């Protein structure tokens, strides 16, 4: 960011924070806080207010009616992946610029309050090299690498200093290669970064690998909220990967991982299954992946829920899983923009991505939404051979100065969600009387304020009337826009 851009960014986030405080202090004045972004960037996380009014009996039917007595899932948070590439780019920035960006992104009082991030356990396809944390055979050789020590941990510590409420979920892309075999029939050693399967003989060592990582992070004042067992377990490609069918994941959790985390002092770290696409990559034997594991009570006792990506299938699978096991959680852990989906075209991506990542995931019972890389350079880098060479970050940074930034759709989506939906919020009922060009989801925060997210897919300004018990407010939705409302206690 240039100094001018830094100043502008801070002004926007500070204005949002100040308006938020004002809205909270002036609830008797019925001030509704409004955050607006449009595809043409004329509104760019812009802050406004409107006013709650007493209902007039002559009013027409409201477009949206909020129903706080109808309650659904509790929300954990929203954020992006803090990959090795993200950390590298952040570390190239001047410290003051980096702090300004992280404050705008994560601070609850001076920014948008993003609060749930994903990190890789070992390398990902956006690391600086291929590696695990135990590349020398023998679990006693587990050790953090320079990528953790010099990049990931300092960045996480800086984020947590800004917002201690930020939660972290960790996911491995592969087990150490000495733990892998070519398949579970031949059991031949498989010294490759991609594909292969976990040798059942090393289930205990691999469970210890997770526990040692959790302890190493804790030793650096970083408490991890949750893990997934394998990133994209049905993907044999990428720069690092490992195939893990549902039967393998079941056996690993049931026989080793669950009790190992418990015995090593991490009984409260949540274990999420799967971490892959809604359509199970169209592999017939892997469909309903988490359901097979939930049906085994000895494995299921250790499992919090299931994580999904959206590179295949639809969000209807979320409700399909929820309806079968409503006590198990759902979280969304990865989506990327890139060349394939015109990722830097905000006019196209803004409303599409909020619909897909914000409205449909949350209305289908997700408790958290996390997108892929927070920050990549203008080339979508650093990245790895055989990994994604066409991905963009939620934010782009120019390598010419490591200052100039462009925020892309995923940054807007997550900021719009996190700014008004607080940790511990509960999704509430909503009656939407508009056409299918107006999409919405609503929540009650722990302080009893209400959060409403509205997507206007119309290409013209659209008047909106929202009813909340015996009050209502109006707002003119700009064309092709995403709007977040924070509504005071009634």
Residues covered by each model-derived region:
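Conserved radical SAM core fold
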Residues: 85-87, 175-178, 231-237, 338
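Substrate-binding and catalytic surfaces of secreted/luminal carbohydrate-active proteins
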Residues: 28-45, 51-62, 168-170, 207-225, ...
